[in-house]
Amino acid sequence: MLRRDMNIADYDPELWQAIQGENRRQEEHIELIASENYASPRVMEAQGSQFTNKYAEGYPGKRYYGGCEYADIVEQLAIERAKELFGADYANVQPHSGSQANAAVYGALLMPGDTILGMSLAHGGHLTHGASVSFSGKVYHAEQYGITAEGVIDYDALRKQAHEVKPKMIVGGFSAYSQIVDWAKMREIADEVGAYLFVDMAHVAGLIAAGVYPSPLPHAHVVTTTTHKTLAGPRGGLILSNAKDEEIYKKLQNAVFPREQGGPLVHIIAAKAVCFKEALEPEYKVYQQQVVKNAKAMVEVFKQRGYNVVSNGTENHLFLVDLVSHGLTGKAADAALGKANITVNKNAVPNDPQKPFITSGIRVGTPSVTRRGFKEAEVRELAGWMCDVLDNIGKDNEAAVIEATKVKVLDICKRLPVYP
């Protein structure tokens, strides 16, 4: 029999220890992985609700199971809030992840073997934009575009490539690109070759919702995003469109269910609804503005300390530090900073001489630190600490510098907790 007072701590101490350990890690480490963020307690409350128990195949008002009246309310709330937040005419809140949202879009609008043109993973794209190891590069004929030596998209080169390969779909969006994308220019190129423009805005969705980064919705046929990352919601996916095309909407609905997925995760959809409501609040815009301010402030410190920043700056929440001129690898930098309780991820840089598991750069993102209250003064100090660690990798005093930095990190984490 079930009881309300059941808990993990008494029943499964090994698992509870891991959960508590992760809680301590998040509180005591500075999180700079650009794709991570801290969900609010309200979002986590929804994820732990009784909707965990509910099967609800189908869509609101058209379910294959009974007892879905409250599931319908939850999903419709999420749909309407997503549409309001992004200025969309269509929203599907059921995708379990960003990758599954992308798979549904491909499945809705393409046939196996059709040509897609997406940003290369090595130049800042995503696995699902046509990488050879992904379904997107196996099911479809994937061509890849890149960035210039200066770290920006060359739209003239993209136009030339599009005319040469004649894709059925051009894929916009990125996982490691720090500049503004000209969505109107991408739509213009897509129209010239008769292609769909599909944008994966997962990394900048929160910035777009707050109006601090240009929205692709007025230009793309279809847009997807995750609901975590800059949006700071539960881990999940979302499909949006403002194409005013009922045929596309019908194809997207059928591609999510029953093509790609069965029953939706109603508890996660409930958490998405909370997340979208939070993103509609005035303070959310202030938060996203600070995310960009913090990223720009950190970039300036790295440049002042002699580190190369890809594209020489940032216009969003992330930037890449190119370590080639310092003779460092991304793997070594990631490990050293990790010992100081600063979490980043190794990342390839343009024309990277290292293998993907080694890399020559690190990706730095500010959504999480901003969420816990860091402003320009704190992130400038943090960037300086990071440079101290990087400057001393492989030197006699490396361990001492790391330990001294860790003490500073623990102090500021105590002053600015994730969940006070």
Curated annotation (Swiss-Prot):
N6-(pyridoxal phosphate)lysine: residues carrying this PTM: K229
Keyword Iron-sulfur recorded: no
Positions bound to (6S)-5,6,7,8-tetrahydrofolate: L121, G125, H126, L127
Site positions (Plays an important role in substrate specificity): H228
GO CC list: cytosol
Assigned keywords, A-Z: Amino-acid biosynthesis, Cytoplasm, One-carbon metabolism, Pyridoxal phosphate, Transferase
Family matches, as CDD domains: SHMT (cd00378)
Enzyme Commission number(s): 2.1.2.1
Annotated localization: Cytoplasm
Reactions it catalyzes: (6R)-5,10-methylene-5,6,7,8-tetrahydrofolate + glycine + H2O = (6S)-5,6,7,8-tetrahydrofolate + L-serine
Pathway: One-carbon metabolism; tetrahydrofolate interconversion; Amino-acid biosynthesis; glycine biosynthesis; glycine from L-serine: step 1/1
GO terms, molecular function: glycine hydroxymethyltransferase activity; pyridoxal phosphate binding
Main location: cytoplasm
GO biological process: glycine biosynthetic process from serine; tetrahydrofolate interconversion
Enzyme class: transferase
Listed cofactors: pyridoxal 5'-phosphate
Function comment: Catalyzes the reversible interconversion of serine and glycine with tetrahydrofolate (THF) serving as the one-carbon carrier. This reaction serves as the major source of one-carbon groups required for the biosynthesis of purines, thymidylate, methionine, and other important biomolecules. Also exhibits THF-independent aldolase activity toward beta-hydroxyamino acids, producing glycine and aldehydes, via a retro-aldol mechanism.
Quaternary structure (record): Homodimer.
HAMAP family: SHMT (MF_00051)
Protein family membership: Belongs to the SHMT family.
Protein name per the record: Serine hydroxymethyltransferase
Record lineage: Bacteria, Pseudomonadati, Pseudomonadota, Gammaproteobacteria, Pasteurellales
